[in-house]
Regions:
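Basic, flexible linker segments flanking DNA-binding modules
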Residues: 2-8, 25, 32-131, 227, ...
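Conserved, non-catalytic sequence blocks in retroelement Pol enzymes and Pol-derived host proteins
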Residues: 44, 83, 128-130, 145-146, ...
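Residue-level signal for the short linker/turn that defines the boundary of a DNA-recognition helix
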Residues: 19-20, 68, 84, 253
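C-terminal domain-tail junction helix/linker
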Residues: 43, 214-218, 240-291
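Mobile genetic element proteins and their domesticated derivatives, centered on retroelements
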Residues: 11, 24-25, 35, 57, ...
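An active-site-proximal beta-strand-loop segment
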Residues: 126-164, 170-172
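RNase H-like two-metal-ion nuclease catalytic core shared by retroviral integrases
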Residues: 110-112, 198-200, 206-209, 220-242, ...
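Active-site beta-loop-alpha junctions of metal-dependent nucleic acid enzymes
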Residues: 144, 148, 166-189, 205
Length: 291
């Protein structure tokens, strides 16, 4: 004979199909009042578990400085061995009024092309990269401070989405780009023969940049003139950086503060802790190590 809890479970399942509870209880020889009491106990356990999860969700939300929404928090909890649905995480976040920072719109920019750049091919168009160090995307973005502008050059791995080299300077000479690429090559010697893709800006068409690529056996690639989305991987990273690292005003107080914040974000957070949607919510470092 089935236990009362087994019968209550059957009653609940059949009731969802349209059968009346009184008829089911009578047919299965179960107490109707006992059935309702079992529902109350079940709801109480669920409520207790939900209350217990609130602290965990809030702790992760604050740990990631309001950068994580329900999907990434859910992945973090699963990684800790905590079984919970993404739907419940979202519900708890709404109850607590936790809302992740909204990503700023991705606004790709155009660059001025040179005659020399027009002869360089786009080697990444239509390609799918299957492991790290096959291709880097490079670009420059502006960093506003109350002390004036800074310029940030970076190179991101097409596969792992790891920032492999970056430099910050107060102007935009070609050395801004060669400096960030040199850092990438020192840290990741397996980049030899990789494709280095960029737009057609003057820093990327300079003699010293091309000479550096040739010396290291790297393949130069440039997007088509006026096609902004050719370099969307790193443009998207700039958008993420400015949403999650920059002040809400978009302007840092000092240049020193900006440099420190960007260093901390890339080295201590983005590369090693931030789950990336295109990597099945793995960290860039995890994608590198798993390849």
């Amino acid at each position: 004979m089935k236990s009362p809890s087994d019968r209550y479970k059957i009653i609940q399942e059949l009731h969802q199909q349209g059968y009346s509870i009184s008829l089911l209880c009578k047919t299965l020889g179960a107490s109707q009042s006992g059935y309702y009491e079992s529902l109350k106990r079940k709801l109480s356990v669920t409520k207790q578990r939900r209350e217990g999860m609130k602290d965990k969700v809030k702790m992760l939300f604050l740990k990631h400085k309001k950068r994580y929404g329900r999907i990434r928090i859910h992945r973090d909890l699963l990684a800790q061995g905590i079984k919970i649905s993404e739907k419940m995480v979202g519900s708890i976040m709404r109850d607590l009024g936790l809302k992740a920072i909204a990503k700023r719109a991705f606004r790709p920019k155009t660059t001025i092309s040179s005659a020399h750049a027009n002869s360089i091919e786009d080697l990444v168009k239509g390609k799918v990269f299957t492991c790290p160090n096959q291709c880097l995307f490079g670009d420059i973005t502006y960093v506003a401070t109350k002390e004036g502008w800074l310029y940030l050059s970076g190179f991101i791995d097409a596969y792992s989405k790891m920032i492999k080299g970056y430099s910050i300077e107060e102007s935009m000479p070609a050395s801004l780009v060669t400096g960030s690429l040199e850092k990438a090559l020192k840290r990741f010697p397996k980049l030899k023969e990789a494709i280095i893709h960029s737009d057609r800006g003057s820093q990327y068409t300079s003699h010293c940049y091309h000479q550096m690529l040739t010396q290291h056996g790297l393949k130069i690639s440039m997007g088509q003139k006026g096609v902004c989305y050719d370099n969307a991987v790193i443009e998207s990273f700039w958008s993420t950086l400015k949403t999650e690292c920059f002040p809400s005003s978009g302007v840092f107080e000092t240049k020193a503060e900006a440099k420190a914040a960007i260093f901390e974000y890339i080295e201590s957070y983005y590369n090693t802790q931030r789950r990336h949607s295109s990597l099945n919510y793995r960290f860039p470092l995890a994608a590198e190590l798993a390849a």
